[in-house]
Structures are given as structure tokens and as C-alpha cells.
Amino acid sequence: MATVGEWSCVRCTFLNPAGQRQCSICEAPRHKPDLNHILRLSVEEQKWPCARCTFRNFLGKEACEVCGFTPEPAPGAAFLPVLNGVLPKPPAILGEPKGSCQEEAGPVRTAGLVATEPARGQCEDKDEEEKEEQEEEEGAAEPRGGWACPRCTLHNTPVASSCSVCGGPRRLSLPRIPPEALVVPEVVAPAGFHVVPAAPPPGLPGEGAEANPPATSQGPAAEPEPPRVPPFSPFSSTLQNNPVPRSRREVPPQLQPPVPEAAQPSPSAGCRGAPQGSGWAGASRLAELLSGKRLSVLEEEATEGGTSRVEAGSSTSGSDIIDLAGDTVRYTPASPSSPDFTTWSCAKCTLRNPTVAPRCSACGCSKLHGFQEHGEPPTHCPDCGADKPSPCGRSCGRVSSAQKAARVLPERPGQWACPACTLLNALRAKHCAACHTPQLLVAQRRGAAPLRRRESMHVEQRRQTDEGEAKALWENIVAFCRENNVSFVDDSFPPGPESVGFPAGDSVQQRVRQWLRPQEINCSVFRDHRATWSVFHTLRPSDILQGLLGNCWFLSALAVLAERPDLVERVMVTRSLCAEGAYQVRLCKDGTWTTVLVDDMLPCDEAGCLLFSQAQRKQLWVALIEKALAKLHGSYFALQAGRAIEGLATLTGAPCESLALQLSSTNPREEPVDTDLIWAKMLSSKEAGFLMGASCGGGNMKVDDSAYESLGLRPRHAYSILDVRDVQGTRLLRLRNPWGRFSWNGSWSDEWPHWPGHLRGELMPHGSSEGVFWMEYGDFVRYFDSVDICKVHSDWQEARVQGCFPSSASAPVGVTALTVLERASLEFALFQEGSRRSDAVDSHLLDLCILVFRATFGSGGHLSLGRLLAHSKRAVKKFVSCDVMLEPGEYAVVCCAFNHWGPPLPGTPAPQASSPSAGVPRASPEPPGHVLAVYSSRLVMVEPVEAQPTTLADAIILLTESRGERHEGREGMTCYYLTHGWAGLIVVVENRHPKAYLHVQCDCTDSFNVVSTRGSLRTQDSVPPLHRQVLVILSQLEGNAGFSITHRLAHRKAAQAFLSDWTASKGTHSPPLTPEVAGLHGPRPL
């Protein structure tokens, strides 16, 4: 327990003697410094510290009471009060010519303060004030032997930056508030004090006084005298009730704004020689201030048009008030008032602008700046509204946030601005003097492009995020409909002929008579009349009923998905009946997840029955998903014809693979079908829980409908694969007909008499009445065309990268850089965008291909391709896929397509194609877009990068050498052919001769339904020594028609590069290698 002569430390509770100022254990000060104590330093503690013993003496004492030390003030200076713990330098005696200054009254604008200062009989020189202020900041006002702590008055060494006792800073960061600006809202005199009412100072407007009295000039003998310091008192007459506006940050002192000519005082009212009627003085004052502070202008304060001005409002009626009275600080928020609709406040610099102004007059910020919805990156510039924020700088002059971070203003010759702290450093300084940021970083940030690398996202996390954002929009729509008592109508897909999309004279178009909501629809199934409408009601695959549309590819995929009801529920974001008729469906269109908003108005006939797909027992999920898909592709008409694998990819967004069971009738030279490998893939897919479907009697097969129907099968129909079993060497599959009827009646069917007893009890073949049956694998291969596998991984990661297929080698080549952090299994899927839209100008399918390489990135991001690790087959389809197991490292994924390459420049041979539609121009105004979907079992990083023009040639050469057929034509020459399974032909020739040229002629004029990247089916080339070249790439043009390729190769050695007698004109390549094809077909060094 502490005695009378002891005190307890607030930090360590040690009992210290009463005369000790700090704790002897932890050196904590006896009294914890607080804000009120610091603020009172400028109000009531008007003492000066002794430079020798640090004792604080009253202002009236000329010598220290303790040690007798007498300071040596400047001539004519008086002891001044200590303001905020800093001894101000006494003002020097100014010798101004007589008549140079006049009495001046009015508001004096300071940093964050608006105070009214009485006239002092002379005008203070502003340059001298700036000099004094700068000297105070540099420490000129401190004693030479050290400095006094403004908190505990201890005299510290000159090199110390903080007090050694209390830890206080050498200089306080509080604003310097002169006594004249302090607010005393009400004066309450304590006991023993007599307050004398103060008369208004001369020069201030008061009762019966003019607001602007005429200025009087001083006489010739009038000498300037130092400003008289009024006797200090907390209740001095110089203290006026002036509120101190609360600023959002400390800023340099604002300049007095230029006064319009009509409101300017006469020249005799101010300092002589000051420029009148212009803002030149303010601009130069700002430049001098910035050069003195050595700080660059902040981005939000600098404008591209010049120096702007942010006024601090001369009236503070609407501002928050901070009152400093005695030992208290009182904060009074501004009282609420009626909103001011004549002005708006800038969100960036807080300047109030007129309502009609679309931009801030100070910083140029848009009136709507800062209002951006959460979601995908904005597609319009927030300032000018131009499409694509990347080229926005060319349309409105504004820069993106990434460019703002790289641009630092202003920089002067011989200086550079630090991007971290904005300090202006000398050009010879390699690091910032304040924060040590290297100067090299400035140059790197100027030329660096914004980072586009991103991590893959968990599949389930992505779905939950998309649903959360979609539900917020849905709730707003439903709330609006409820308030206005209306039902939702989707104006972007209106109930009309355009949404149906069939030709005007088509029978389907004519049968659509009306669009009805569920409560208005007549049910076509009699047993469902008493059922109530719902989105789901214990959904089953057999609930699906096809309508007039030929979209069985989609319904077959939906039936396969219905084997897992949880997957169907993930497709429907709105899972319960909505009285307002607004529903949301989440689909993956062309590899991109999209949440589609639709209403519940469905096309019906004149009897009120649904015409398109529906579900039994008055369920809406089939009709709503079909309508959402029709909206995505433009109309119901666009949903006709397709493959079940496309539907699975659209509904799940998962990687899908199709296994062909039959040889291609359009290309007999394709690789033979390996039934054992397909069986192994089906077994592993079943164990992994993947979805599987099978196409019966379609595609490449010649079908006899009567033969199929006699066996209980339906040709050109999709079945779901429920189970795959290998029982005692017998390969069996269990399938389901989505119709719920028509089952297989051959061997291993329910009524087959040769069932082994133990297998009948184990496999329980009793579902033929519901369309479920067992089938032997041999019969399955005989009657079915293909197997579609949907690899649904609920715990995998996914990333999707958009890009485009260049239509020539002169366009930038897009490559996706892939960073694998730990060993992972990856699936790649490449989708062509807009391949199904009915309104597309050129929606023909491309010959898609994926190539995965080991890669290295050198200095400057230079990409070097390594070994080929995986690839897909080149196929004219809506999407292709491949899978690979990758170790940690850097990889590059190249996506390519060639059958859309445009014709060469004028003056060169016209493009030559041998196809049924050779006369149709294939060049598209814009390169076709694509989406690369990356699925991985572990976290990976993806980044789209721009490769060199020759990267595509290097990728094709590595592919052909790795997977093509090798042919040694002659000594030192090697030819590589890639044709089987590649939807065309690729020919690469290698010349290993150290000195001789190799002349090669490739003739493919007898080919059919192919197009050449060279623009001609006949080429001649001269390959230099120790080089190799991609001679030609032939690509299948029409995917639904067969193609044939014949090629003849002639070659010879030559001492010169010219082709001589092979061409009419002297040259090394025919057709010539124009910039459009040189990047792909130019010779490459070995």
C-alpha cells in the first residue's frame, strides 16, 4: 500500500518516491500525458524552459529562477507564449517603406481554420512569415544545446528524435492553433477573476460600424513597429467564438482564392505590388509551398488541366465544431438541416459543385464516381461511358487505377517522385531518402502492364458466390413487383414471335398462340389435373416430356443429370414457386458461367397447353431450364440439333469427354476403336461417380429403324448409364430410357431365360417396365454410337480464361501461362464462343485443339516452349478436352484453330479451298472468341500472356515432331506428317544440311472439304540450311461432312535459295510469305 510520500506507477505498479518524475523500474512518466494536457499547453501554460536546467519560468522572468541563466533574445523581441509546445521565433523588425502597408481587416484563411484577426496597424510581410515557418520546421527555434520536450519539459540532446523520459515526439503533429482562433463559446469566470467586457477591436465590423472602413495611409514619419503581443489570458478579448472546422486530413495551407474583379478591393486597401485580378499569385504560392515541402501532389489533388482550387467554405454554419475551453475539448456535430439540392459534393475531393455540372471542377471526377456494382469488372468507363476500360484513355483522357498507381506527379528535371511516399528525390539518389524505395521500381511500374494472374477457385465456392449475387438481384425484382402489385415480365426475352425464332411460315411458329403463366396453363396429362404447380416435386428422369422442338440432345443430358437430383437443384437458383413469376437459372454457356433471369410465361397453343418441353406432375424445372437456355442462345429455334455432351457441359460446367464406339464414316483413315480402353474408362468413371450417357444408333452409324425397334431400342436416342459391372468375366451395363418405357429385350434383359441364378439375385433385373435394363457390352458396342462422360468433381478447383483465335499469324498469339504449385490432376476444355446463336453472322465450327507444354519465362516475360506434355485431338466441334497429371512448375497452354484464316493481302493468290461451300467467304470481321476452362484437383495459377509471333510455329513443330509420322526423304532431310485424328494435315520439313538449301513442293490439289493456311493447296518453299518449316496446314472446313486429303511431296537439294524453274518469278516461297502467314510458315532455326 502506497504511503503519503509515494506514488504508484501506472505501467508496472511500482511504488516510487514522491519527488521522482519517472518510474525507477520501467521509466514510465508519473503522469500519463493526455490530449487535454497537451492542448492546454497553448492556453494556460505560458512559460519558457531554461536552456540549461530545463526549468519552466513564467513569461515575466528574464532569468531562470533556479540556475540564473539569462537567455539572449533577438533585439526588440519579447517573451512570447509557447504555442503547442513549440517556441515561436520572435518576429523580426521589418523596415518597410512608408505607405507600403495599409490597415486590413477581414477573414484570414489558414490550414483548416477560419479565424477573424483584428487589424494590427500594419500588414505583415508574407514572405517573412513563410521564412519563419520554414525555420521553425527545420529546428531553428530550438536552443543550440538541445531541445525541450513539449510534454515533460526535459532538456534532450540535439540528436534525439523523441524524449528520453516520456517518449514524446520532438515535434507534435497537432495543428498550430493561435490563441486568436481558439473557441470559447461561453465564458464562466472562476472565483477570484474579474472579467472585463472587451470592446470590439478596431477594424472589425460591429454595431454601427462600417463593414469595410476606408483605408488610411500612415504618415511619412510612421515607423513600423513589431506586432504587439497582447497580455495572455484564457479570457482575453482576442479570443473570439470562431468554430474550428474538422478537416478529414491535414493539408498544406489553402491559398486565398482569387477575387473577381467586381468584388476586389481598391489597390490602396492591400499590399502594394501584389498582382490583381488573376490567380497567378495563388499558383506560384502553391509551387513554392510544394518545393519547400519536397512533396509531390497527390493524385486526387492534381488535375490534368492545371492547378485547381478546393475552397474550405467561408461559412461554418453547417460544419462540425470542436470547442477548446480551459481543460476540456467539446465536439459538437453539425445539426441536421434540409438537404441542399443546388450543389453536390465530389466523392474524391469533397468540393461542392453546381448540380448541373457533370464533373468536379477541381479534380475532374465524375458526378457518379464510386457507384460500381459488385461483380464482374465494369464494361464501361465510369467517367466517359466508353466501352472497354482499357482503351478508355483514348476517348476521355482518364486513366485506370492501375495506371494511376504507376503515375506520380509532379516530377521536375533532376528529380523523381517516390511511388510509395511521394517524396521528391534527387535524380542521382538510387533509393528514396524517406522510405528507401528503389528508384528502379518507378521505371518498372511505368512500363508494367496490370497483373492478370489469378488463382483457381473452388467449384462449390464459385457456385455459392454466384448464387448470392443473383439472389440479391432477384429479391429486388420481387420486392418491386410486390410493391406495385404486378407480375414480372422479362423485356430482354419478351413473349413474342422473336423469342420463338422459327420462320414465319413454319408450323411450329404458327402453333404458338399465346404465352401463359403456370396458373393459366391447362395440363395435357389428365392424371395431373389435381396436382399443384411447383418447381420440384421429387423429380425423376422419367418426368421429362419432349415437345415440338428437336432438342433431344438437351433433354437427354437433363435426364442423365436427373439421376442426381442434387445436381438439377444446383442448376435452378430459384427452387421454390415465385408468385411474382421471376426465376433464375445458372448455366455454363460456351464455358462461361451465367445466371439467367426468366419469367414464367411459357408458349402455349390455342387450348392453353404447353408446346415445348415440360415435366409431369406440374413441375416447372424442365420448362424453366429450357427457356433459360433459349434466352442464352437467342431463341427456341436455336436449340435444335446437338449432342448430349454439349448439354452435359452446359448444365454442369464440368469437363466432358466423348468416346466414339464406331469408326468414322466420313474419315475411314481414323484410328481404330479400342473397346478395351473404352471399357476401362467406363469402369473408372463409374468408380469416380461421374455422369455417363450413351447415344443409340446415330452419328456415324447406318441405322435400320425396324431392327432397332424389334429389340426394344429407339434409334437416335440418348440413354443414361446407371451402372457398369464386370461379373466373372462378363461385362454388363445397366441403362435407362428417359422415356420410362421401351426396354431392351435381347440377351441379359429381364425376360432372358439364361440368367444365372446367383446373378439374377445380385443384379435384380426387374425394371423393364420403367425403362431400366441390363445389356452385355458386346451388344452395347454393336448398337450404340458413343459414350459421353461428364466428370463432375465437387471438390475440384476451376479457372476460366477468355481469349480469341487469331485469323492470321500477324495477330497477337494468346497463350495461357499455368503455374502448378503441387502435383495435381488437370482437365482442360476449350469452348468456341457463339457457335449456336441463330443470329451469328459466321457461326461455323472451328477446328479446335489444345496443346500443353512445359514452359520457361525469361527476362522480359519471353516465353520458351519446352516438351509437349498433353494435347487434345484437333476436331471441328463446339469444344474439345484433354487431361494430364502435372508436377509443380511453369507450363503454357496454347489454343489454336486454322479453318477460319482469312485470305491474304491483295496482289497475292486468292485463297483456295476444296469444299462444298468453297465460295463462301470464311473471314470474320472479328476473330472468334474462345474460353479455356482449367479444372484441377489442387490450387493453380493462370494468367493470359501475349507470346511472340513465332510461338504458334514452334508449337506446331513440336507437336508434329512428337506425334506425327516421320519420313526420311533424303540424307539430311526429314519430313513429319500429322493426319490421323487431326481433322486435316500438317506437314513439317527439316533441313539438316549445313550449307545446301532444300527445295520442297507440296501438292494437295486433289483434297476435298479442306482449307489451307497458305491460301493455296499447292506450295513451293526453299528451306535454308539448318532450318525447318511448317509447309502447310490443311483443316477440315465443314464438320458435318466428310473430307479427303491427298498430298504429293517433291524435293531437291540446291546451292541457292531461289526456286528457279519451279516458279515464274524469282523467289523463295510460293505463295509468298506475307506478314499474315510468315509467323507460322517462316523457316525456323534448328
Curated annotation (Swiss-Prot):
A zinc finger (RanBP2-type) spans 3-32, 44-73, 143-172, 338-369, 412-441. It is linked to Oculogastrointestinal neurodevelopmental syndrome: An autosomal recessive neurodevelopmental disorder characterized by growth deficits, microcephaly, global developmental delay, hearing loss, and microphthalmia and/or coloboma. Other congenital anomalies include imperforate anus, horseshoe kidney, and structural cardiac defects. Some patients have been reported with normal motor and cognitive development. The lineage of its organism: Eukaryota, Metazoa, Chordata, Craniata, Vertebrata. It is an enzyme of class 3 (hydrolase). It comes from the Eukaryota. Residues 111-148, 199-280, 299-321, 1064-1086 are annotated as: Disordered. The keyword Metal-binding applies. The keyword Repeat applies. InterPro entries: Calpain_cysteine_protease, Papain-like_cys_pep_sf, Pept_cys_AS, Peptidase_C2_calpain_cat, Znf_RanBP2, Znf_RanBP2_sf. Belongs to the peptidase C2 family. It comes from Homo sapiens. The modification Phosphoserine is found at residues 296, 335, 338, 1070. SMART domains: CysPc, ZnF_RBZ. Keywords: Deafness, Hydrolase, Metal-binding, Microphthalmia, Phosphoprotein, Protease, Repeat, Thiol protease, Zinc, Zinc-finger. Residues 125-140 have a biased composition (Acidic residues). CDD domains: CysPc (cd00044). This is Calpain-15. The active site is at 552, 717, 737. Widely expressed with higher expression in brain. Changing residue 720 to F: In OGIN; uncertain significance.
